Amino acid sequence: MSLKNWKDNGWIREHRTSRQETTNLFAIVERDLSDAASTQLSADWRFGIAYNAALKLCTILLFAQGYRPEKSLAHFRTIQSLPLILGESKKADADYLDICRIKRNTVEYDMAGAATPADAEELIGFTRELLADVRAWLASHRPELL
């Protein structure tokens, strides 16, 4: 399936991004990665903050492709767009982030203590790697957004 198919299905809509919007989103990512590294916060909060940073990176990619998610399943669609943009080799990364999405929802809405410090550290490390991948992709495909 392609992003055009997603648009035709009504899952995403057209969006024109800008360098300023991308800069603002990267600033959120950097802030969230810094905050998530604080061991003064619970593992649940650190995990949720790191998840937000990863989600913003997926958002940057989707925006750079000229789309934004519709309201229904917005996080899910944004995450699942990762392999459509960066390539099929990122399918496992999208699957991992979807598992993180579910866990983040659990610790945000249902119960405390479901995320461990190791979970938070793993997601922080993953997000740092994804940040490098997103910057490299933008430099190659949409340098005007950097």
Language-model segments: residues:
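Terminal alpha-helical segments
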Residues: 1-146
